[in-house]
From Swiss-Prot:
Gene label: addB
Name of the protein this chain belongs to: ATP-dependent helicase/deoxyribonuclease subunit B
Organism: Clostridium novyi (strain NT)
Enzyme superclass (EC): hydrolase
Cofactor: Mg(2+); [4Fe-4S] cluster
Keyword Transmembrane annotated: no
Alphabetically ordered keywords of this record: 4Fe-4S, ATP-binding, DNA damage, DNA repair, DNA-binding, Exonuclease, Helicase, Hydrolase, Iron, Iron-sulfur, Metal-binding, Nuclease, Nucleotide-binding
Family: Belongs to the helicase family. AddB/RexB type 1 subfamily.
One GO-annotated biological process of the protein: double-strand break repair via homologous recombination
GO MF entries: 4 iron, 4 sulfur cluster binding; 5'-3' exonuclease activity; ATP binding; double-stranded DNA binding; helicase activity; metal ion binding
Keyword Kinase attached: no
NCBIfam families in UniProt: addB_Gpos
Task of the protein: The heterodimer acts as both an ATP-dependent DNA helicase and an ATP-dependent, dual-direction single-stranded exonuclease. Recognizes the chi site generating a DNA molecule suitable for the initiation of homologous recombination. The AddB subunit has 5' -> 3' nuclease activity but not helicase activity.
Residue positions binding [4Fe-4S] cluster: C771, C1089, C1092, C1098
Subunit composition and interactions: Heterodimer of AddA and AddB.
Length: 1134
């Protein structure tokens, strides 16, 4: 028995020496057992290297293995545990169950126990304790030695969970961490290592469990060889890059001394004859000097090493893709000789996929794929969520949209529209026939409902309350079979293979077996234990998140894309390290885990040694940098970004500054300067997709009259003559010349849309004034939003208007005068109307949930308050209602409002106004129009002038000019007013009396609008007016005169009405001309696009030449009156 160290820095040929040594031993004795032990992740590469080097029959005596495989082989030889090995998912499930049962007894972790990720954290610490050979008993024994009370409670919780885990585990299982412990006990009886020579390569450190196995190997093997990546002759302190390896050497020497193992003369590989860097003096210098202080800078220009500075990560990857594409065409470097590695593979993975696909670069991303976003996994968790969350819309359609539910996409879309429109929620509604909506689709909708609900109902019938774990798993399996999931997946796999998508085919061919394996694991762990569904779905989710799918490279000639920690090959000729930015590489360890650095230090002092703290990990990160920088044989590219995707500045890593110090003349490439399209830049020509993208940039520049090189004409010609690209090129041409301008529609089409007899509403003409295109989409094309089962502001407005209208009808029929109505009768009547209308609402939305029922009561309060205010208004006023919901139209009380266009054609305006009031005074009739508003609508003369508020003045004019209403000598305007429907909250600095509160409510609901500038008329509107009115926008000054704001003379009202008519005529004429321009109005406070539903259709963008707002400058009332006066004079002169 002997032991030999093999020393050498990175690239010195340690792995090569081991394989050569194995070949030499094999030639000396073909029967001798020769064993090479490497980390599990190195095993494939090591086996490949051994097979390539060692040939002949003796190869059968050479074994490449890992500690994990040794356990497997020894157990097969001498027998292992009688217990099954639980996988990591099963381990998480077991820990979840333990924590779930113990959480009330935990001191520190009681709250954290319910947090996502806590189970994984506990699993990690248990794994760590086992690997460092710390038992639960030993951990608990430290409690009396710990002074810090919080740490003591934390260790108490951990040891408690650890004890319960070990007890539960060892009843039936062992986990992967127990395997090495069992191997230590079993290896003595194995003959596998008897007389064998062992080489151990690629380890920088070992766990206490592995050290124990090494002790056994030293006892049984003829010789054990271990490689150590370090400089034998260098004095190494605790901060040196080789410090982790040095600590390993010291620990091994302690064991050798304790076991009295003979130490053979070490092998010291000389870096002067280094094999890996024989073709690059720059890389050899880098390996020797990167961590050397002081150092002598490399005084030559670098050819093999470059720094690439990019604008952002996307540009960073595109730069290397261009270079790889060029190198693959111009040199003998194959794709398999190239690696792209990063410390942030998650952040760069999607970018690499996108860009490498564009550049047609074959690649393999070396990572295990998570499965929790696979459609089958989503389906299973969603089905359980359906039952846990009362058949919620979200869970139901997450399930249906997986594509595995045996329901077509078209059926899912139809069903979703219906469910959203009518608020289908809950098992009861899914079981009952649906009867709302269009009868033409009800039969089809109910067929789909049954198709969806029947398997779910059958499934849920087997899961009531708590169910045994094996029963739940069996029900899940039977459900999946009942909807044909496995058959659908098989069809997908076949489809993916036919499409050449081997990666997806491989993923989906494994997923079914993975799910079955996980369900089996649940049954194994929980057996007949009863579980609630909410816990079952958590258990499943833990398992699904833990599962990782190993992928095999589909071809040999591919670029390797990997995390820096997973690069396992030394056959790389060109290495790109991307994301060399501050905080990314080297990584900054922030998460200390359940045990902080301080906790670990305290435990170490009392004899419990576990994994390194974050400070030690920082030194390990330095060693990782060393290993990474010395991976390549010939070329090295250090790549970093100066900004992220949002333009936020990023700093280069300390690695970049170190390179610039070592290599003062290092080449640094940058894409910060815009590409030159004027020169014949052949570098812009590469693969089809990226070259096409550059061509598009050229075409844009040409469109902007910027000079470009003539050679792009040849590029354009190639794409235009290529059948695969011609259509795409034409589309790009159209896009570049696109202005987003909308042409006028022909009169013929306009007539087909709106008909020859034009009936329009004033509110629609207001919409047209706001944006012609928006009007066209809504009323011409009749585009509709997807109907959602919810109360929208328009729904509420309509509901409240209807209640007030019906209340008005009841008042009229009862014979009451408004000023005679008592508060109690008002409240009872409103309440009864609201309740009845709520019951009659489509889909029963007002009674569909406790929230909506509460909202209905709130509506009652609002309406009662508003109607009581209306009653108070009318008690104070000489104006009394002569009509509610007054309609203008063929079948209405009053005929349509007729306007004549300049062509002689007549347009009929139809609609209704909420209320018309009249005052009889001295053979004159004064009329006022009142419009109820549930929002904060204010009257604006400026908006009236621009045609944005037309309704009140249009209806006032119709009333004043209607012959049927003129039973007196003269009909005059009294005013136009908005009345807000609300239940205002009154705030006061002191206790207010009931009368004061009432006054404050009246102020809050004061009507807004325009009144006739006549003191007597105003005083009739508010007979209690003193100073500022509580109910109308008017003021009586101390001298008895009328305030000037919000009033207009008879002449001004006439001019305003005339101007409104002109606005109506112009809007109608523009509409009939086919003007549907994208021309939204913009005013001081808002624009027409703010709440527009059709922005995704019009794609209005002021960057387009023809896309501009129609800006209206807000005008003061005085300015409007002056403009109207001038208009009137001009009309009179004509």
């Amino acid at each position: 028995m002997s032991f030999r160290f093999i020393y050498g820095r990175a690239g010195s040929g340690k792995s090569k020496f081991c394989i050569d040594d194995i070949e030499k031993r094999l030639q000396e004795d073909t029967n001798k057992q020769l064993i090479l032990i490497v980390p599990e992740q190195f095993s494939f590469q090591a086996e490949k290297s051994v097979v390539e080097k060692v040939k002949g029959t003796g190869i059968t005596n050479v074994k490449v293995t890992s500690f994990e495989r040794i356990a497997y082989d020894v157990f097969n030889e001498v027998g292992g545990s009688t217990h099954k090995i639980i996988n990591s998912s099963g381990k998480l499930m077991l820990i979840f169950n333990i924590i779930n049962n113990l959480k009330d007894e935990l001191k520190v972790f009681a709250t954290a126990a319910n947090q996502e990720g806590f189970v994984n954290n506990i699993s990690d610490i248990i794994t760590e304790l086992k690997r460092y050979d710390v038992t639960a008993t030993e951990l608990r024994a430290t409690l009396n030695l710990i002074e810090d009370e919080f740490l003591k409670d934390k260790i108490n919780d951990i040891s408690y969970i650890f004890e319960q885990f070990q007890e539960s585990l060892h009843k039936n299982y062992i986990d992967s961490e127990d395997e090495l412990t069992l191997l230590y006990r079993k290896i003595d009886t194995s003959k596998m290592f008897d007389g064998a020579e062992v080489w151990i390569d690629e380890f920088s450190s070992f766990t206490p469990q592995q050290y124990k196995i090494l002790e056994k190997l030293m006892e049984k093997a003829s010789r054990v060889n271990i490689t150590l990546c370090m400089d034998y002759y260098r004095v190494i302190d605790g901060t040196d890059v080789f410090a982790p390896t040095k600590r390993t050497e010291e620990k091994l020497r302690e064991i050798l001394k304790e076991k009295d193992v003979k130490l053979d003369k070490p092998i010291i590989l000389n870096n002067d004859d280094v094999n890996r860097f024989k073709d690059s003096s720059e890389l050899k210098y880098l390996e020797e000097n990167y961590f050397k202080y002081p150092y002598k800078p490399y005084d030559k220009t670098t050819d093999d090493i470059k720094i690439i500075r990019a604008l952002n990560p996307y540009s960073e990857v595109e730069n290397i893709a261009k270079e790889i594409a060029k190198i693959s065409m111009e040199s003998n470097i194959r794709y398999r000789d190239i690696a792209v590695i990063t410390r942030d593979l998650e952040g760069y993975e999607k970018i690499v996929k996108t860009i490498f696909d564009e550049y047609e670069i074959p690649y393999f991303i070396d990572k295990k794929k998570e499965i929790d976003d696979n459609p089958l996994i989503v389906l299973i968790t969603s089905v359980i969520e359906i039952f846990n969350k009362s058949w919620s819309y979200e869970a139901m359609f997450r399930y249906l949209k997986t594509g595995l539910s045996n329901v077509s996409k078209e059926e899912v879309d139809l069903l979703e529209n219906y469910v959203l429109a009518y608020g289908i929620r809950g098992k009861k509604k899914w079981q009952s026939p649906w009867e709302y909506g269009n009868e033409n689709i009800l039969e089809k909708i109910n067929e789909i409902r049954i198709k969806v609900s029947e398997p779910l109902i059958k499934f849920s019938s087997k899961l009531k309350g708590k169910s045994k774990a094996d029963e739940i798993c069996s029900a899940v399996y039977n459900f999946l079979c009942s909807i044909g999931v496995n058959e659908t997946i098989e069809k997908w796999v076949y489809k993916f293979k036919n499409e050449g998508n081997q990666a997806l085919a491989k993923e989906y061919s494994q997923i079914w077996n993975m799910v079955i394996e996980l369900l089996d694991q649940v049954v194994e762990v929980f057996k007949e234990e009863e579980l609630q569904l909410k816990d079952f779905v958590k258990i499943l989710s833990l398992g699904f998140k833990d599962y990782k799918m190993g992928l095999i490279p589909p071809s040999l000639d591919q670029v390797l894309v990997s995390d820096v920690e997973r690069v396992r090959t030394h056959e790389i000729k060109l290495l790109y390290i991307i994301g060399v930015n501050d905080g990314i590489f080297p990584a900054v360890s922030k998460d200390e885990g359940i045990l902080s650095d301080s906790d670990r230090g305290s435990l170490k002092k009392i004899g419990i040694e576990i994994a390194e703290d974050t400070k030690s990990k920082a030194f390990e990160e330095q060693y990782l940098i060393y290993r990474t920088l010395t991976t390549t044989q010939k070329y090295l590219r250090i790549c970093y970004s100066i900004a992220d995707y949002e333009g936020k500045a990023l700093r280069p890593s300390i690695i970049v500054s170190r390179f610039k110090s070592l290599f003062p003349k290092i080449a640094e490439e940058s894409d910060n300067i815009a590409m030159d399209y004027e020169e014949e830049n052949i570098d812009l020509i590469s693969r089809e997709i990226p070259t096409f993208n550059n061509l598009v940039s050229v075409l844009r520049r040409e469109d902007n009259k910027v000079k470009v090189s003539p050679f792009w004409s040849d590029v354009y010609k190639w794409y235009s003559e290529n059948p695969r690209w011609k259509e795409t090129l034409d589309t790009v041409f159209s896009a570049i010349s696109y202005t987003n301008a909308v042409d006028d529609i022909s009169e013929e089409k306009i007539r087909k849309m709106y008909g020859n007899k034009l009936y329009l509403t004033v509110s629609r003409l207001e919409k047209y004034a706001q944006c012609p295109f928006g009007y066209y989409i809504k009323y011409g094309l009749k585009a509709k939003e997807r109907k959602i089962f919810a109360l929208t502001p328009p729904d509420l407005g309509t509901f409240m208007h209807n209640v007030i209208d019906e209340f008005s009808e009841v008042v009229d029929k009862s014979g009451f005068k408004w000023y005679e109505i008592e508060d109690k009768w008002c409240k009872d009547t409103v309440s009864e109307i609201v309740d009845r209308k709520a019951e009659e609402s489509a889909g029963g939305i007002f009674t569909s949930s406790a929230r909506y029922k509460y909202f209905t009561e709130r509506l009652k309060r609002v309406l009662i308050k508003t109607i009581l205010v209306i009653i108070e208004h009318l008690k104070r006023s000489g104006f009394q209602p002569i009509g509610h919901e007054v309609g203008f139209g063929n079948d209405e009380k009053y005929p349509p409002i007729e306007i004549e266009l300049s062509s002689g054609e007549k347009v009929k305006l139809i609609g209704r106004i909420d209320r018309v009031d009249k005052l009889d005074m001295e053979k004159k009739d004064y009329y006022r129009i009142i419009d109820y508003k549930s929002g904060n609508k204010d009257f604006s003369l400026s908006d009236v002038y621009y045609g944005l508020q037309l309704q009140l003045l249009t209806y006032l004019d119709a009333i004043l000019t209607n012959e049927e209403l003129k039973d007196r000598e003269e009909a005059l305007p009294g005013g136009v007013l908005y009345l807000k429907i609300d239940d205002p909250i009154i705030k006061g600095k002191r206790n207010l009396s009931e009368e004061e509160i009432q006054d404050e409510i009246m102020k809050a609901l004061k009507m807004k609008g325009l009144l006739l500038a006549d003191e007597e008329v105003v005083k009739e509107m508010d007979r209690k007016i003193e100073g500022n009115s509580l109910i109308i926008p008017a003021r009586i000054n101390k001298d008895g005169s009328l305030g000037k704001s919000s009033v207009g003379t008879e002449e001004q009202f006439r001019l305003l009405r005339e101007h409104v008519k002109k606005n109506l005529i112009k809007a109608c004429e523009d509409m009939l001309k086919g003007d549907i321009k994208i021309r939204p109005i913009r005013s001081k406070n808002a624009d027409a696009c703010t709440y527009c539903l059709y922005s995704s259709i019009c794609e209005f963008d002021t960057n387009f030449e023809d896309n501009e707002f129609k800006v209206v400058q807000e005008k003061k009332d005085e300015e409007v009156w002056e403009l109207l006066r001038k208009e009137g004079e001009e009309s009179w002169e004509k």
